[in-house]
Amino acid sequence: MASSTDVRPKITLACEVCKHRNYITKKNRRNDPDRLELKKFCPNCGTHRAHKESR
């Protein structure tokens, strides 16, 4: 089981407009302590939108 202090935890990325959780990825907590935000394609909206790390 993954520890809560894991260096590379799994995170989900949610679309900022429609709030659907479309992507699962990993991030390095030491390099990116803040919330991750990427511009990715949202299949629900049909366009490229900003996706933020959700809890």
From Swiss-Prot:
GO BP annotation list: translation
GO molecular function, one term: structural constituent of ribosome
Keywords: Ribonucleoprotein, Ribosomal protein
Pfam short name (any one): Ribosomal_L33
Coiled-coil regions listed in the entry: none
One term under GO cellular component: ribosome
SUPFAM superfamilies attached to this UniProt entry: Zn-binding ribosomal proteins (SSF57829)
Database matches in InterPro entries: Ribosomal_bL33, Ribosomal_bL33_CS, Ribosomal_bL33_sf, Ribosomal_zn-bd
Disulfide-bond pairs as recorded: none
PANTHER family reported for this sequence: 50S RIBOSOMAL PROTEIN L33, CHLOROPLASTIC (PTHR43168), LARGE RIBOSOMAL SUBUNIT PROTEIN BL33C (PTHR43168:SF2)
Family statement: Belongs to the bacterial ribosomal protein bL33 family.
Record-given protein name: Large ribosomal subunit protein bL33A
Species the sequence originates in: Mycobacterium sp. (strain KMS)
